[in-house]
């Protein structure tokens, strides 16, 4: 006799689906960011390893992923972020999160980052994770 077992999809797939649903239902949220040059964040500071470790930790705790890495973030083109864009390096990368504490931790760990926040989705920022790259 065959046995049928329910399988649970990996937490990463569930988190991506939940985030997709939130984005498609115009769920307004506050996003926090830490912005740095690509050279600093991707080459000089091995931050990708930190993000991998954090993702693993979230997965073990069945916690929804609330942070993303965005190269050349489009949100900087919003009029309300003109000042941040003026201060941003030409080739930049952002760590974006809905968790303010995580961005504060990033700022403390890295120091040389610009931080801020924005509301999305909005007319100026329809997709908070869009990249110009």
From Swiss-Prot:
InterPro entries for this protein: Ycf54, Ycf54-like_sf
One Pfam family name from the record?
Answer: Ycf54
Q: What family, per the record?
A: Belongs to the ycf54 family.
Q: Mind telling me which PANTHER family this protein's record contains? A: PTHR35319, YCF54
Please identify the protein, giving its name as recorded: Ycf54-like protein
Q: What organism does the UniProt record list as the source?
A: Synechocystis sp. (strain ATCC 27184 / PCC 6803 / Kazusa)
